[in-house]
């Protein structure tokens, strides 16, 4: 092997290690979510706690493009807190959650816009259904 090929070999090796680390990190987060989401669905864990921990795990995982995912989980933390505090009903929360689940594998800011719009709509509907105080 020539000395010219050595840097290329090292770069390839490091890239392979980085890809493995990223893949392992993503799989670890996905496994955690699959294990804990049923706890939130059954009421054994608050939705806000689930999404806050999910957000923390994603933020601490070395992933190349995690920006839209972090934003989407932030939207879900907000939506779940509104739901738990009665500012959004179950149908509204499920609407936001459904959009997030549908687009969870797409790193697209447009998916986040849909989730934010669903949350705003749920808040508006909730406010309209409550009598003035």
What role is predicted for each listed range?
Residues 1-19:
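Sec-dependent bacterial lipoprotein signal peptides
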Residues 18-133:
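Acidic, Ser/Pro/Thr-rich low-complexity regulatory regions
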């Amino acid at each position: 092997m020539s000395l010219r090929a050595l840097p290329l070999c090292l770069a390839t090796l490091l890239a392979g290690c980085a890809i493995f680390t990223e893949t392992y990190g993503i799989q670890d987060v996905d496994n955690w979510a699959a294990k804990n989401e049923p706890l939130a669905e059954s009421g054994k864990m608050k939705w806000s706690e689930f999404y806050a921990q999910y957000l923390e795990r994603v933020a601490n995982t070395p992933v190349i493009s995690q920006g839209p995912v972090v934003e989407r989980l932030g939207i879900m933390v907000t939506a779940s807190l509104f739901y738990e505090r009665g500012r959004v009903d179950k149908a509204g929360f499920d609407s936001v959650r459904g959009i997030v689940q549908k687009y969870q594998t797409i790193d697209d800011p447009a998916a986040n816009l849909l989730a934010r719009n669903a949350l705003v709509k749920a808040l508006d509907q909730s406010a309209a259904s409550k009598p003035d105080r």
